[in-house]
């Protein structure tokens, strides 16, 4: 197209002529008539005055309309040509008009360009000077620059189109005429019409008509000449003889050039063609060569099939190739004749400077003409240098089609070109006439070497085909398939994409390059082509280079590469689908050109791609392709070639064994190891879901994970759902998305595992007892795991014992049982640490700090938790997550402000900071201002109009205010409407407000929902306020359009739900009455849409003003069951969430414990607490679970919850069962079921329960003889303990008895503490408590049992007595020191009591009463009371004088501790008569103590209060008694006990809670007097101990002795309690137990309080002794003597009074009793 512009003709007639001559004649030479040839011959003399119409390659449009009979409109052709020319050569000068080939109008530059065009047409490879047709032709004459030859340019053109035409044009006028005569064998009349039509088209151009007519005529005859042999023969002979004159040759060359220019109109190619003036010379030879091809006379190309039609571009190329060949050998001097100095210099300049060729300036419009097209052709053959050269000799192949470069762009297959060239071209001629050989004036183009080198480049191209076959390289070329030549021209003439495509086939075949120079195109064209061919060949090897040379490789590439590309994408999927496609991997195409780089994939060597196409892709994408495959596939990495694929096939199995690291390396962009599967040689072994894919992939090599390599895939892990999703998202990784992360492990692990499986076969000894028939072969053994209560895990693995036999090389395996191991479940299963650290149960305000810390930790954990696991954010899930965090924050505020959310300024400020962060700092900028700023809308309130006012006025005049209101609304006079409606019914005012909100607020646009809801609340529309957030129509599922809605895009009707926070904040900041109704309504709305957390927040903020918000799941009115749990949508699973239960417990703690006006506990929550306790027990947190059980019992037994419907039999049964199991289970860190008592436990809450048992529960149990149903069965020996006479009940009696004397007192109902029943109850009850309460309970109950055990000992009297004596003697001391010692005697103490059983029987009634009292006393002493409890049987006195004696005893004990010797105290302790009196008191006390009916009750506070009271009373008594009875040592002793009490740990406890004196203190004083009267002994009003002793005397000595013995056992230390030593024992029988007389002085203080009660009972027991504790020492001995029938009696005697007992305890009971006697 640019060629036309160079010639100065825009009409395009020349192009049409070319089509007529090139297309029709070339393809259909038979169409031409002799007349046409004749006309051409005649017209050869016509001067070339219209070269302006330089032939252009036909445009695409022309190609479509290339009908020879009708030419397209001039304007169409011109426009198309102009466009192409401008695109190809933006810098090209305007087309030259009326310029001939010889002389071009314009600058010399333009002339040089035209010359170059001419050269391009002629293709001067030899450099002969007669090439330049531009210079050879004169502007005026239109003849060649060589004056000798007058060539008819039109004829030349016609010949050029037809190859023969070029020959005709090149010859001089005479020669042309001769030739014409020879050629014109057919009439041209037929063709004249066509020529005329073309001339008519070109009528506008000067001389164009004639010129084109000549051209057309010439073109047709040319074709005819091709058909006629004789003419061609003549022409051939003429050429061979060298008759053709240089001028003629130049002319012919010009004609040919013009023809080529037309055909080859390409941006850069034309430039080179234009620069080829030297081509004019070869054009002559071409003429000679072409003539044989075109002329029927001369058949220089017999190789061409006459009947075969060749594309004109092919024929043209052949002509060009042959021209230089013929010219060079035939006429070396022709150049001189043809070329002028100027022309030669210009050509030299053009040819000598390679840069000029590349520059755009040289790329002239004229150059773009035929030269560009020719260059393209040349480029194509140049790339396939060898192939093209060989094929180029036949001129016909390119000659016919050269005229149109656009046609070449049209997509002529390069393969076709190459093949045609191969057939037509004579490789020898091309070689002989290579451009380097024919360079004129000694000019050598730098491209000459490339021509020679072409064959060398061709071999590499050949290599490329093996790599990926031809397709891969072509794929690259295809990708750049035939870009406009102009685009390639810019890089350099060599790279015209148009030229590249034809050579694609050529480069692959690599024909000799020499033939390309032969082509008519200028050497410049050829040279650029060569350069392009080089990169293109390289491109083959590397996929990217292929892209660079798309044109050259295009023909070949398009075929294979396109399929390969789809294969890449499809292959990964198929591979992942476990389908081993034989086709190349989707990525193999890319690697095809770079098969050599394939080694790079070796890094992926872990999995060599199978020899099929897939192997190559795997190397690229799979983490570890086979190394060998990688070598081939490294190129495949870029793009896998078929060759690589084949190599991969062989390698895939080996590389699979490669390490996972290599697999990870597979894709640089894919750090993830998804390719691991590919690396696994034994993919089939992999069990994962991706394994099947691996199975197929094993052959295919690792799946291509290029897409799946992203780290995101690795995160989810193979089993994660996210990974599955990724697999689908990324087909390449779909194959192993899940296993991609596991792949590295699976690869290394599975492959070897698979290999190891067969190797692990063992030869088992088959059983013969029938087990061998077990299909599961369980006789081979299998691991066993068993989960036990309390978070223990039992496991055992079978052992395989080898057995060898003679003659056997390998042993046979005999499975046997393995070791059984236990471990806490926490070591096996992970736990949620934040939840495990919950500081529950929450029973006191002291837990507030811990609760706040825990809440903060949980909030931080929730905020830091990832919102999603798969990278996909679900809006609904995200909203719920945010709402959940807000809920926890609101609960924290509730705890911080002691259960108040509203009504407190601080609490409201905290809530505001939660609902609207930043509002505190920016009150004017945060949400409200932002809301106002974002509000937008076109609707605005209308100003009051006179018309509206008039209407309102009229309505008011008429007295119709309601009508006036709606008139105001209609006119949007809202102020008037509201003012008037306020005087009417409130409903009218609400309606007006609603209308105002709907039309004035909601219409404003966005972010008005919250404000509208607030206005509704102001209007009193509480329930309807939620309609502003979500319209009723939306809730009903309808889509409504508001007439008053503001402008803007429609929005989701449910979007208002996200405004709930702003709405709640507005309500809180603008409180009005009954706004809680709106909050509750908002909560229900949110709950209906699944926003449970937000709903619960609204309910909490609303409070309980509108009714309870918590309830059971079956309660339809309950808004909340568990905070954060949706019981509506998940009625059966909502309780599974532990967080919900714990958060609700925190709420309960804030409202019922921290609140100023505490509300009752949540009754429905207790069942959930019980479930939580079960969970804790399962995890091994038994102590926490037990605490929960106790807390639940305390709440259940409280008065406020007694009648709750939530407490039913099923609940109680579950609670009781869990409590018993926790007691039976070993305590933490202990393997025994008995917990060791400790001081901390003694001071724990367990004492409260112990006190409750002592007060009434134990008594009931004792009377029933079975105790609590669970109590008797608590311990492992509980049932045995049920028959104390048979053996000592393994209760905690001995060791714990000292601490648990109060529980044994319960047997008081049985009538005797010493009775076996009481013993049984005491031990079993104590173990129960000890278990439930850990060491504390155990410690407490054993003492009572100890007391009983003493009496029982008397039953068993022999061995047990000494044991008990020892135990008690030591126990009192040690009891206080450490209940653990008692624990050791758990049940034995009771057994020890058994020997004393007979005595117990005697004293049993007395014991009962003291026992009853003892519980109370024990409640006071707690720790020491237990020891005294052992003596409590003797403490009937205590029932009367409990408090009094306790006080005195305490002082006495401290003072009397040294006088451990007092045996009388023992005897006094034995005095049963006092017990009878005490029994009454004890009974009375029992009546007082029914409060503590159940062990479940926590009476810590009560116990402390009682203890304080008793202490106070005891102090008073001690002071009085010290002043009266102990004036001497008693006073000092009294002080000592005080000090001792302060020193003792019990004293510390009671000292803190010293409150009102207990009634018993008074009784103690009275008891001393009473005892004096009843016994007629021990009358010592001052000394309550003596009084107790007096009361004790009445009972028989023996009976008293056993009882006293048991008591004394507990009281042994009591002797020291007495100032004298005796009063102590009588006064504090329990005290003696706790502290033996000799060395237990330090303990008296605690014993005093705790022992007091025990001492009371002991005092009752040692009637005489207890009565006269101070004075009683002498009486005590008497009693002890009378009672001391045996050692047991002596031992029992130490039951002396409280005071003595307490002191004696520390010193040692046995010491006092035995030694005294």
Curated annotation (Swiss-Prot):
Similarity field: Belongs to the SEC16 family.
Pro residues compositional bias, start-end: 606-626, 1635-1647
Low complexity: bias regions: 475-498, 1600-1616, 1648-1658
One GO cellular component term: endoplasmic reticulum exit site
Source species of the chain: Coccidioides immitis (strain RS)
Sequence segments annotated as region (Disordered): 209-253, 290-339, 382-722, 1260-1505, 1529-1564, 1582-1717
Subcellular location: Endoplasmic reticulum membrane
This protein's UniProt keywords: Autophagy, Endoplasmic reticulum, ER-Golgi transport, Membrane, Protein transport, Transport
Chain's role: Involved in the initiation of assembly of the COPII coat required for the formation of transport vesicles from the endoplasmic reticulum (ER) and the selection of cargo molecules. Also involved in autophagy.
BP terms from Gene Ontology: autophagy; Golgi organization; intracellular transport; protein localization to endoplasmic reticulum exit site; protein transport; vesicle-mediated transport
Membrane disposition: Peripheral membrane protein
InterPro entries found in the cross-reference section: Sec16_CCD, Sec16_N, Sec16_Sec23-bd
Residue ranges with Polar residues bias: 238-253, 384-407, 417-442, 629-661, 681-699, 706-722, 1305-1320, 1341-1360, 1446-1457, 1677-1686
Compositionally biased spans, kind Basic and acidic residues: 226-236, 296-312, 1486-1496, 1529-1544
Record's protein name: COPII coat assembly protein SEC16
